[in-house]
């Protein structure tokens, strides 16, 4: 990608955020926290580039957080955990749905990636994946298809049912499977952001290449811990 093209694309990214106090953290109610990124911007190279990570975390995620704080300020939603709000999302303002989802989804996303990621899940999670999908390779193929075929912007998810079995789904925009508006509800244990801002600087329109690269940074111990906690 040329420097000129990068400059144009970054400009488009910035224009699309449309957040006040851009890149500056807003005061937050007790239940909301903008957590530090758990690794350096360049830590996931060469699979996810540093420039994308910096823009994604410092501008996009920060923007969702700032707008969420403003959306709940002075309402009965202020101070309540997002997971509680998600159960009645169909009754709440669109600004809470978009920015609450954006903040929660990205907080999970950063944690389920690691510079020491990749490989295969072990233990109970590995067994659950095999039981639910037949094999790890079959799971990867199904998840990759969900991510690659999600039209427009959205997320692909690995989720847990109440009985401990796993399923794959995708959601549009910043929705997630905890929301009562989701086509299929469950507990997400990891997700992949397939908005263009997550990959376009490096992969352009090759979303499939981005999805394939993602497997090299999946933090399986973190995903396993989330699975165990949800049981």
Regions found by a protein language model. Name each.
Residues 9-20:
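Bacterial N-terminal signal peptides
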Residues 1-11:
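Bacterial N-terminal signal peptides that target proteins for export
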């Amino acid at each position: 990608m040329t420097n000129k093209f990068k400059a144009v694309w970054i400009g488009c990214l910035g224009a699309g955020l449309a957040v006040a106090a851009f890149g500056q953290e807003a005061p937050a109610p007790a239940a909301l926290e903008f957590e530090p990124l758990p690794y350096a911007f360049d830590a996931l190279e060469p699979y996810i580039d540093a420039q994308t990570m910096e823009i994604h975390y410092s501008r996009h995620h920060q923007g969702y957080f700032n707008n969420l704080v403003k959306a709940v300020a002075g309402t009965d939603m202020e101070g309540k955990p997002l997971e509680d709000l998600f159960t009645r999302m169909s009754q709440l303002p669109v600004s809470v749905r978009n920015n609450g989802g954006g903040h929660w989804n990205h907080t999970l996303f950063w944690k389920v990636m690691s510079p020491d990621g990749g490989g295969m899940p072990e233990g109970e999670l590995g067994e659950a994946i095999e039981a639910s999908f037949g094999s790890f390779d079959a799971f990867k193929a199904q998840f990759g298809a969900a991510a690659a075929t999600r039209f427009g912007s959205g997320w692909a998810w690995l989720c847990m049912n109440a009985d401990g079995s796993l399923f794959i789904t995708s959601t549009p925009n910043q929705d997630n499977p905890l929301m009562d508006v989701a086509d299929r509800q469950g507990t997400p244990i990891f997700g992949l952001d397939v908005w263009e801002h997550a990959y376009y600087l490096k992969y352009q329109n090759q979303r499939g290449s981005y999805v394939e690269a993602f497997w090299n940074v999946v933090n399986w111990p973190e995903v396993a811990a989330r699975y165990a906690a949800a049981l």
